[in-house]
Amino acid sequence: MRTTKGAARRQSKKRLFKRAKGFRGGRGNLTRTVKETLLRSGAFAFRDRRVRKREFRKLWIIRINAAVKQHGLRYSEFIHGLNKAGIQLDRKSLSEMAIHDAAGFKQVCDKVKETLAA
């Protein structure tokens, strides 16, 4: 008797189409197109996991710069002052502090100003 790929092929296609749920047109219905689209989406996902890190760092720096300008400093001066003062806060926590804890951020800025003046 001739054997076919029946069950195995069905499972394989089912797995593919499950991953392609929500894709429009042939990208969600046609096996070859689905495979190509999934490969491409995987490549984008891989790339963008790295891009995300860059984007967030940029956002934190922009926020810190805006907050620091209100206290009469520039971002580069502020970071230099932080390092000189030995304050080990990362950019993420500094940006959160600038948004949610203005008083605490002001204290950090004052400490940096003292360190830079000395």
UniProtKB/Swiss-Prot annotation:
Gene3D superfamilies: 6.10.160.10, Ribosomal protein L20 (1.10.1900.20). One of its GO terms (cellular component) is cytosolic large ribosomal subunit. GO terms for molecular function: rRNA binding; structural constituent of ribosome. GO terms for biological process: ribosomal large subunit assembly; translation. InterPro entries: Ribosomal_bL20, RIBOSOMAL_L20_CS, Ribosomal_protein_bL20_C. Binds directly to 23S ribosomal RNA and is necessary for the in vitro assembly process of the 50S ribosomal subunit. It is not involved in the protein synthesizing functions of that subunit. Belongs to the bacterial ribosomal protein bL20 family. This is Large ribosomal subunit protein bL20.
